Regions:
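Conserved N-terminal structural module of periplasmic/extracytoplasmic solute-binding proteins
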Residues: 2-105, 295-298, 403, 411-416
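Extracytoplasmic "Venus flytrap"/periplasmic binding protein-like
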Residues: 62, 66-128, 160-162, 169, ...
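Hinge/lid segment of periplasmic solute-binding proteins
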Residues: 102-149, 173-175, 201-203, 208, ...
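Extracytoplasmic/periplasmic solute-binding protein
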Residues: 141-144, 150, 172-221, 264
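Conserved C-terminal helix/tail region of periplasmic/extracytoplasmic solute-binding proteins
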Residues: 160, 239, 365-416
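Extracytoplasmic/periplasmic substrate-recognition and gating elements
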Residues: 162, 239-243, 279-343
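Glycine-centered hinge/linker elements that transmit conformational signals in sensory
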Residues: 178-182, 219-248
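Long, aromatic- and glycine/proline-rich binding clefts that accommodate carbohydrate-like moieties
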Residues: 288-292, 340-388
């Protein structure tokens, strides 16, 4: 979720051809009374058995039965590569009709997208906190499709072995507990500041000290005193040996897998960590739990909430608008939202689906955190800022936090 947004670079020929094949330019355009829609979606699966391709092709087949004149071609792209590949496709004017993944604001700025109200009958059913995030200059273009929130996962067996009797509430608790776990030969706290999702891990720690990427007025505050102090703390946490070595080179998914193997005591995670734990076959459901994330002086009252968006491209004028609307109305039914969430351990984006899952023992605690969730900045400058965060913020825990954060702040101010 909130996926890799690197600067547009030359991708492999295979990647470009893959999206070119999905483009609705040229041979894939509609013919006669029939319509062909091309959907490019991020793959959230952990392998062939639960690839997102299977999910979307199932919806496409059901939809085609109900609407024989409309065919939906499905292409899924590795979650980590989605943004780069879509950007390359758009740059080459090979537009998909519908995308489901991350990142919409630059395309809205360029006038390439339909508004939500133009391609969905009931956009009011989308969760308000994320609908607002999907807006650009007062109009909604990004349609939240799947959401997630963050909690602190910890290994109860390692806690017991280390003599820890309760979940950490503060940063001091985190450090003390992590060092006790380290003394037992395991990694105390997993700190993924590598390129996969450093922007998310960083924000969780910023929030713990009253910081953020922006303040309430919308001013960039990346190098604020609070954030510098946060990374000074993390630098000390790393140097103490409480984390894995070199967090700036460690990606979230890799550390999640180590947690699932019982090698890490604590790590910040989302519901997407649960299937990794289940597939690891090392930790039973009673061996781990999740709780609110510890802040400097107490647990976070609001955590990071993220969502991935559907975007509908104005591909070939308005000739496909009605077909896109039919498909999105179909795909956003509660049964498909719930199916997606249970398959990939993510959260719904519609109010009706969230209500149906509120009492679910797995999803309930995460859904409870969503209404107060904090999101990433939604303006177009965030694309460049996020890339720099992913590439450099890990060096703040081994070098000079003030300098590293100041460089990112300069990028944000220059873009704004």
């Amino acid at each position: 979720m909130n996926r890799r947004l690197a600067a547009i670079t030359a991708l492999s020929a295979a990647a470009a051809l893959a999206l070119s094949a999905c483009s609705s330019s040229g041979s894939s355009s509609s013919s006669g009374s029939s319509k062909t829609l091309n959907l490019v979606a991020a793959d959230y699966g952990t392998g062939p058995a639960n690839s997102s391709t299977k999910y979307w092709k199932g919806i496409a087949a059901d939809f085609h039965k109900a609407n024989p004149s409309i065919t939906v071609n499905v292409k899924t792209v590795n979650w980590n590569d989605f943004d780069n590949q879509i950007q390359t496709s758009v740059q080459n004017h090979q537009y998909p009709d519908i995308t489901e993944g991350d990142y919409f604001s630059n395309y809205a700025q360029e006038g390439l997208l339909y508004k939500a109200s133009e391609v969905m009958s009931n956009p009011g059913n989308l969760m308000p906190v994320f609908s607002k995030l999907g807006s650009y200059k007062g109009s909604q273009y990004g349609l939240p499709f799947t959401t997630s929130s963050r909690t602190l996962f910890y290994n109860k067996k390692l806690f017991q072995a280390a003599g820890i009797t309760s979940a950490p509430q503060t940063w001091d608790d985190v450090k003390a507990d992590a060092l006790k776990i380290k003394a037992k030969g395991k990694i105390g706290f997993g700190l993924p500041l590598g390129s996969e999702e450093a922007q998310g891990e960083s924000l969780l720690w910023m929030l713990g000290n009253g910081g953020n990427y922006k303040d309430a007025s919308g001013t960039w505050t990346i190098d604020s005193a609070q954030n510098v102090a946060t990374f000074d703390y993390l630098k000390g946490l790393v140097s103490s040996g409480a984390t894995e070595p070199n967090p700036g080179t460690k990606n979230r998914t890799d550390l999640w897998k180590q947690f699932a193997q019982g090698e890490i005591g604590m790590i910040n995670g989302s519901p997407a960590l649960i299937p990794i734990i289940e597939q690891g076959k090392v930790l039973s459901s009673s061996d781990w739990t999740s709780v609110p994330i510890a802040g400097k002086s107490g647990p976070l009252q609001s955590t990071l909430g993220v969502c991935d968006f559907v975007a509908a491209f104005k591909n070939g004028g308005t000739s496909k608008q009605a077909a896109i609307k039919k498909f999105l109305d179909f795909a956003y039914q509660d049964k498909y939202q719930v199916q997606f969430d249970k398959e990939y351990k993510l959260l719904p984006a519609t109010t009706s689906a969230a209500t149906s899952l509120a009492s679910d023992p797995v999803f309930g605690p995460f859904l409870k955190a969503l209404p107060k969730a904090v999101q990433y900045p939604s303006d177009t400058v965030w694309a460049n800022v996020k890339t720099q965060v992913q590439q450099t913020i890990g060096t703040a825990v081994t070098g000079d936090p003030k300098q590293v954060l100041g460089n990112i702040q300069a990028t944000a101010k220059k873009g704004g």
